UniProtKB/Swiss-Prot annotation:
The protein's enzyme class: translocase
Entry membrane topology: Peripheral membrane protein
Binding site residues for ATP: 170-177
Subunit description: F-type ATPases have 2 components, CF(1) - the catalytic core - and CF(0) - the membrane proton channel. CF(1) has five subunits: alpha(3), beta(3), gamma(1), delta(1), epsilon(1). CF(0) has four main subunits: a, b, b' and c.
EC number: 7.1.2.2
Source organism (scientific name): Marchantia polymorpha (Common liverwort)
Disulfide pattern: none
Keywords tagged on the record: ATP synthesis, ATP-binding, CF(1), Chloroplast, Hydrogen ion transport, Ion transport, Membrane, Nucleotide-binding, Plastid, Thylakoid, Translocase, Transport
Record's protein name: ATP synthase subunit alpha, chloroplastic
Record's subcellular location: Plastid, Chloroplast thylakoid membrane
Length: 507
């Protein structure tokens, strides 16, 4: 038997006492009273904060939204099918945050920034809160750089600047998503990070958009955040904020970002569902009272940062769907009042074959020509005026039988200008191509052509300029001004090509 000395025993006991750590861990715990429809009512959780994450026994996470006198109403970020009445819930002490990094470019993620494209985990460099405060007044500067969409109708008459919020609004199936996707495709080589947020859409539609990005090489600078129609309402409500947090990560690193929310009507519906199930009082159209704040705090995060913060920017293009062209409904009026202008897409124009179906009369950009290069200002000034006069004349001409020659000429010019604004989907044009196209139309060079020949002629003219007058594009790109030399080159190209075109058409 081993002899143990008494002093050894006392030293062992002393060591054990020294190592004893009297740390009391307080865990805030509650009990599920009721669960269903993506909502849980919890008893207890006395110290929980509004918006705090809570964790259920099965690992499902929820957000505590309603703090009432006798219970807590939490929304579930998952289906929560295995949560039972009486199971325990613990408060985590955290609020919703997501991992962010450059590695997110080219990936498809959900509202919790977890990959859903089957390409493996995404390494994160830091975390950002999903709900971050928007930059203050001192942190911003006014919008002055153009964000080219590649669509003539927008870049010439409803220009968008970097840091602006421009609403795309219209009925279903009028090409709202197409305008947004063309804008993303046009950012290729512009050093702009794009974020496309799909809220409550069909999974097939999202897959189609991702395929378009892949085919056109746009996915390398784009992040897709998708919560489809079968996702829980909580995740559909969070998806836009997740997209904004990802875009902010790049904005604060001195980069330019573009974010598309497709669409905010579905987010408002998801929020309405959550609010009604939480028994919050309904307001107009059964939306809760804070639905304005839902969108304003999201869209205020788009900004052009001041030079002290590195001049990064976040341009937001929210999409809102109207019912039968009713712009005076609750959500459309709210978002119109928050944004810096709107692009209105009309079902009638779309069905008449005018695509993109932009109603230039009621579409506006509240930033205006500050978001255009000088060359575009020089040629596009007349375009909007001529189109407005044409629309007025066209309405009048329906009732008048004999029109004088000047009116007939103006109507003919207007028809050709309208033809000039038509563009195929996924075919954005560079600024110099747009300038050449607009100049040709406004200065009457298209008047000698039939309306049906305009599109073909303009496509050939743009090709002719690239091959025979490459200096034109170089001047516009380098000086950003429509100089006399550029105008002369363009005039030469137009006159040379019109002769050639008419000769070929006669054959």
């Amino acid at each position: 038997m081993v002899n143990i000395r008494p002093d050894e025993i006392s030293s062992i006991i002393r060591k054990q006492i020294e190592q004893y750590n009297q740390e009391v861990k307080i865990v805030n715990i509650g009990t599920v009273l009721q669960v269903g429809d993506g909502i849980a009512r919890i008893y207890g959780l006395d110290k929980v904060m509004a918006g705090e994450l809570v964790e259920f026994e099965d690992g499902t996470v929820g957000i505590a939204l309603n703090l009432e006198s006798d219970n807590v109403g939490a929304v579930l970020m998952g289906d929560g099918l295995t949560i039972q009445e009486g199971s325990s819930v613990k408060a985590t002490g955290k609020i919703a945050q997501i991992p962010v990094s450059d590695a997110y470019l080219g990936r498809v993620v959900n509202a919790l920034a977890q990959p859903i494209d089957g390409k493996g985990q995404i390494p994160a460099s830091e975390f950002r809160l999903i709900e971050s405060p928007a930059p203050g007044i001192i942190s911003r500067r006014s919008v002055y750089e153009p964000m080219q969409t590649g669509l003539i109708a927008i870049d010439s008459m409803i220009p968008i600047g970097r840091g602006q919020r421009e609403l795309i609004i219209g009925d279903r199936q009028t090409g709202k998503t197409a305008v947004a996707i063309d804008t993303i495709l046009n950012q290729k080589g512009q050093n702009v990070v794009c974020v496309y947020v799909a809220i409550g859409q069909k999974a097939s539609s999202v897959a189609q958009v991702v395929n378009t990005f892949e085919d056109r090489g746009a996915l390398e600078y784009t992040i897709v955040v998708a919560e489809t129609a079968n996702s829980p309402a909580t995740l559909q409500y969070l998806a836009p904020y997740t997209g904004a947090a990802l875009a902010e990560y790049f904005m604060y690193r001195k980069q330019h970002t573009l974010i598309i929310y497709d669409d905010l009507s579905k987010q408002a519906q998801a929020y309405r569902q959550m609010s009604l199930l939480l028994r919050r009082p309904p307001g107009r159209e059964a939306y809760p009272g804070d639905v304005f704040y839902l969108h304003s705090r999201l869209l205020e995060r788009a900004a052009k940062l001041s030079s002290n913060l590195g001049e990064g920017s976040m341009t937001a293009l929210p999409i809102v769907e109207t019912q039968a062209g009713d712009v005076s409904a609750y959500i459309p009026t709210n978002v119109i009042s928050i944004t810096d202008g709107q692009i209105f897409l009309s079902a009638d124009l779309f069905n008449a074959g005018i695509r993109p179906a932009i109603n230039v009369g009621i579409s506006v950009s509240r930033v205006g020509s500050a978001a255009q290069i000088k060359a575009m200002k020089q040629v596009a000034g007349k375009l909007k005026l001529e189109l407005a006069q044409f629309a007025e004349l066209e309405a009048f001409a329906q009732f008048a039988s004999d029109l004088d020659k000047a009116t007939q000429n103006q109507l003919a010019r207007g028809q050709r200008l309208r033809e000039l604004l038509k563009q195929s989907q996924s075919a954005p044009l560079s600024v110099e191509e747009q300038i050449a196209t607009i100049y040709t139309g406004v200065n009457g060079y298209l008047d000698v052509l039939e309306t049906g020949q305009v599109k073909k002629f303009l496509i050939q003219l743009r090709e002719y300029l690239v091959t025979n007058k490459p200096q034109f594009a170089e001047i516009i790109r380098s000086t950003k001004v429509f100089t006399e030399q550029a105008e002369n080159l363009l005039k030469e190209a137009i006159t040379e090509h019109i002769e050639l075109f008419l000769f070929q058409e006669e054959k």
